[in-house]
Design a protein with these regions (language model features):
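N-terminal ligand-binding lobe of clamshell/alpha-beta domains
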Residues: 20-418
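Bacterial Sec-dependent N-terminal signal peptides
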Residues: 1-29
């Protein structure tokens, strides 16, 4: 079985490399490298090159070590979104950069960036990734953020308030909206990388592309497996540095912390899933509410759809095969979900919505059994760090859904309130 897995990984890497031949900094003919095992992430492949004498290049006089991170395009099967060459800082890393440059080829089919690691200054456009960096022990790397009003991390707010104070330690600059970031502020930050969310048919990043700063396209949110998204922290751990292992002025890697954190999350998630499977099928759960004329609900193979399945809850679209959201009409939802036991949704800002307010929004809500029984659960994402915590901690959201489906034998709800 293990041999089959290795062969499969090798074939996958070969296909990814073939789809990205002719890149700006080719790892190409150096060595095949060792592919890291990714149990759940389908969009990320990491290949490590170099580990002592076996990979020393006698002709080049280099004992090289570097890694490749290959990000598959979530919106176009069989193609690459981005390729990253992670090369350690320091003298040996400088030699590796020069070696790869001499092997450079042309006619790139996908974007490739060389990133010197560990990254010690970064603009981070995504709140969950800011939270993750705190957990990995590298919050000082965050030097700029976007959409500050939507970030529920007290220390980020505190450090952002110190922006402009020349005596402040590790202040954070508000770079404006992630859809139209303040380029001048980003230039002033002098970041070593920019971390952002890619979107389908975005057409690139405009002026950001012209800064010649590596753009880390965090496509983790497109993973359908809850643990698949969390597993991306292994990549981010390789990218960023912490103060603990600092040597010769260069930060230590967050990679060991990321690996151990993911192992802990995986163990807890699988334990909860196994416990939930031991109970009878739980209550039926409907998520979200109407937006305009559309009611968006998770597809059966989406992250939330899989979480509901792993919670052993009933879900009206559990047989659906889509991995993204389903855009349904309110009439379609009511026709299929009138008898749902629990209605759980998110909102932003203000007091929890009363039943009267919900009916003002849409009178059809009164047709839901969960509405009439008062089984309405809400989470205010303006005050509760829901996205910040659950994006890379699916075990927290799994526990939440288990409680909603099976009662409080697993404890009290952390995010949703009745």
């Amino acid at each position: 079985m293990k041999k089959q897995y290795i062969l499969l990984c090798g074939a996958t890497v070969a296909l990814l490399m073939a789809a990205c031949q002719g890149e700006k900094t080719a790892a190409a003919d150096a060595d095949a490298g060792d592919t890291l095992e990714m149990k759940y992430a389908k969009l990320l492949t990491i290949v490590k090159h170099g580990d002592g004498e076996e990979t020393s290049d006698v002709a080049e006089g280099i004992d090289y070590q570097y890694a490749e991170a290959l990000v598959a395009n979530p919106w176009k099967a069989g193609t690459m979104l981005h390729r990253y060459i992670l090369i350690p800082k320091g003298e040996e890393g400088d030699k590796t950069v020069a070696m790869l440059a001499r092997r450079r080829s042309t006619g790139a089919r996908c974007t490739t960036d060389t990133v010197r690691t560990p990254v010690e200054r970064s603009a981070v456009f995504i709140a969950p990734h800011c939270q993750l960096m705190y957990e990995l022990g590298c919050p000082q790397v965050i030097r700029g953020v976007c959409d500050l009003d939507y970030i529920n991390i007290p220390d980020v707010k505190k450090r952002a308030a110190l922006s402009g104070n020349t005596s402040a330690q590790n202040p954070i600059v508000n770079c404006g909206s992630s859809m139209a970031p303040d380029i001048e502020r980003i230039i002033a930050l002098n970041p070593e990388a920019i971390l952002l969310s890619p979107f389908e048919n975005s057409g690139g990043y405009g002026k950001l592309d012209k800064l010649h700063i590596p753009i880390i396209e965090a496509a983790d949110y497109m993973e359908s497996s809850p643990l698949g998204r969390a597993e991306w922290m292994k990549f981010y751990g390789m990218l960023f540095g912490n103060e603990e292992g600092k040597s010769n002025g260069i930060s230590g890697s967050c990679e060991p912390k990321a690996d151990s954190l993911f192992a802990k999350i995986e163990k807890e998630y699988l334990s909860l899933k196994a416990q939930a499977a031991g109970y009878r099928k739980g209550l039926s759960i409907l998520t979200e509410r109407k937006t305009g004329n559309v009611w968006y609900v998770p597809g059966g193979q989406s992250t939330i759809g899989i979480l509901l399945k792993d919670a052993n809850a009933r879900y009206i679209f559990e047989d659906d095969q889509h991995s993204g959201s389903l855009a349904m009409s309110p009439e379609q939802i009511l026709a299929k979900g009138k008898q749902v036991d629990v209605w759980a949704f998110k909102y932003f800002g203000g007091a929890p919505l009363s039943q009267a307010q919900l009916l003002q929004e849409y009178d059809g809500y009164k047709a839901l059994a969960a509405f009439n029984r008062g089984n309405i659960y809400q989470v205010d994402t303006s005050t509760v760090p829901y996205f910040e915590l659950t994006s890379f901690h699916p075990e927290l959201l799994l526990r939440e859904f288990i409680i909603l489906a099976h009662g409080e034998r697993f404890g009290k709800l952390r995010f949703y309130k009745k």
